[in-house]
A protein has these predicted regions:
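Outer membrane beta-barrel
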Residues: 122-316, 385, 389, 394-421, ...
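N-terminal periplasmic/intermembrane-space "pro-region" immediately following the signal or transit peptide
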Residues: 21-143, 396, 400-414
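Glycine/serine-rich loop-strand microenvironments at binding/catalytic pocket rims
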Residues: 61, 81-98, 170-188, 255-282, ...
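Bacterial N-terminal signal peptides that target proteins for export
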Residues: 1-8
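A short catalytic or substrate-binding loop motif that flags glycine-/basic-rich loops and adjacent residues
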Residues: 118-119, 249-250, 347-348
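N-terminal signal peptide c-region/cleavage motif recognized by signal peptidases
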Residues: 16-18
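Outer-membrane beta-barrel pore domains
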Residues: 320-497
């Protein structure tokens, strides 16, 4: 732009050359210089206006009739505008706006065309290029836990531990309206673990019917809490339906996932191999996973949720060990598990489950159940795992549960009155019963747990959690066999950005 201004000044000087050829007086020269300076200043002002670097002059207002003023809209996380910046609309009023990799095609198109360079609303900002083509957002989460167990008949279970449930850092973004990507690593075990890492394409089939396709290292779409991120679960640990009725590869696998979205639900189909690893000596396991959810009732203050899911996997020759030690009273107490005992020689597994729940105003409830059938070598009978749970919560501050109607899971809440703005935050009371049964094996155990909890959301991305768990186990193998029961209390500080 400096070169344009210089050229403009030269044009003005050249236009004055004939006058200089007439050998003007000193007064004429001074007048000419003043005229040229005025012309150059006028041209520069026009260029500044084209660049948008100068503010528009306020309209004249009669002194006797001052124009009424309208106070600026409050800058809330879910607002459609923050100053002049357009913020992406959330999928529900009680949620924060989605990041670039979770937007539908209409949200992406609107944000790209808005002309904003920065959006705020979900922790760290979303950055846009000036032309609206490129979108970028840093992302991450910090979940710090402390837990203490007491009351067990085994001293080895009565321990107090600390840990990082998640310590993630990553990024997400998009190019244009349709292409998007996400990458995230976890450092919670004091080593690097790749979690989500994918690219995707989204589009609209017709009004009210969208799709996207993701390829890469994908998080399972399986069950209500199983599809909810670790930073959004209402309890410190997911239900045993999510942790026990699961493919052998775990929560992630490398593959492809097309998803279809309509106004009252969604469906997904996933085909994956193993997790990201360094073992390319044998073929991966093959896992096919599908899930669908439907909201037959969906209003501004209530939702009914119905969901079904299932998976089938053919196990690799390197993944035939099916031994399970499932969390029942706290992730960071390694002695507190429900165990299958040693189980070798797996050929394939099939799992399925159902979800039923919803919310009315600030109260929510969710029931989940599932089974997993493992087929074994050597003519042995199948191993059947069974799990179910019933959960509920009440936001005593009147906030709506952070239910995401697009995905059929919980998400980041939009807190009505954050403490950083002088409010109380959002306070939620929770309760859950869960039951797990591995006793179809001679060495398999069983267990159940009842949890009472409190979640205090300081704002939309900072949360304090407290859980009190009464657990009961009866293992037939391992160091802690026979009936045993006790208490585990846990606290968490969580920040998601």
């Amino acid at each position: 732009m400096t070169s344009i201004r210089t050229a403009t000044a030269l044009v003005a000087l050249l236009a004055a050359t004939p006058a200089l050829a007439q050998t003007p007086s000193n007064d004429d020269l001074a007048a000419l210089v003043r005229q040229q300076a005025a012309e150059i200043a006028t041209l520069r002002a026009r260029l500044d206006r084209l660049e948008g670097t100068t503010a528009a002059a306020p309209a004249p207002v009669a002194a006797t009739a001052p124009a009424p003023t309208t106070p600026p809209a409050p800058q809330l996380a879910q607002s459609d505008t923050i100053g002049r910046d357009t913020v992406t609309r959330p999928f529900a009023p009680q949620l924060v706006p989605p990041g670039p990799a979770e937007r539908d095609v209409a949200q992406a198109r609107q944000a790209n065309a808005a002309g904003v360079t920065t959006e705020w609303g979900a922790g760290l900002p979303v950055f846009h290029s000036a032309d609206g083509i490129y979108t970028f957002k840093p992302r991450g989460r910090i979940l710090t836990d402390v837990s203490s167990t007491f009351g067990s008949a085994y001293d080895g279970r009565n321990i107090t531990t600390t840990g990082m449930r998640a310590l993630r850092l990553g990024l997400e973004g998009g190019v244009g309206t349709h292409f998007f990507y996400q990458f995230e690593s976890d450092f919670s075990e004091n080593e690097v673990d790749i979690v989500t890492a994918f690219i995707g394409w989204r589009n609209r089939i017709r009004p009210g019917l969208d799709y996207d396709v993701r390829a890469g290292h994908l998080f399972n779409d399986r069950g209500f809490e199983g599809s909810t991120g670790s930073d959004s679960t209402p309890f410190m640990e997911r239900t045993v339906v999510s942790t026990a009725i699961i493919p052998q590869r775990g929560f992630y696998g490398v593959g492809i996932m097309p998803r279809l979205f309509w106004k009252t639900g969604h469906a997904s189909l996933t085909l994956t191999g193993d997790r990201i690893d360094g073992n390319q000596a044998v073929s991966d396991s093959r896992t096919v996973l599908g899930r669908a959810h439907w909201n037959p009732i969906k209003t501004d203050h209530s939702v009914l949720h119905v969901g079904l899911w299932g998976f089938d996997e053919a196990l690799s020759s390197a993944a035939t060990t099916l031994t399970r030690n499932t969390v029942i009273g706290g992730r960071f107490n390694g002695a507190l598990r429900v165990s299958t005992g040693a189980l070798l020689g797996g050929r394939s597994t099939t799992g399925y489950g159902a979800e039923l729940g919803g919310y009315v105003g600030p109260v929510w409830v969710m029931a989940e159940a599932g089974e997993r059938r493992a087929r074994l070598t050597g003519g042995r009978p199948d191993f059947l795992s069974k799990a179910w749970s019933l959960s509920g919560g009440w936001f005593v501050t009147g906030d709506l549960p952070p239910y995401n109607p697009r995905l059929g899971s919980f998400g980041q809440p939009r807190v009505l009155k954050p403490i950083f703005e002088g409010g109380p935050g959002a306070i939620e009371l929770t309760a859950r019963y869960e039951n797990l049964d591995y006793t179809s094996l001679l060495t398999g155990g069983r267990g159940w747990a009842a949890t009472a909890g409190v979640n205090w959301y300081l704002n939309s991305f900072t949360r304090l959690q407290f859980n009190w768990v009464h657990w009961d186990t009866d293992n037939r193998a391992g160091a802690f066999t026979g009936p045993d029961s006790g208490e585990t209390i846990g606290t968490r500080i969580a920040v998601t950005f």
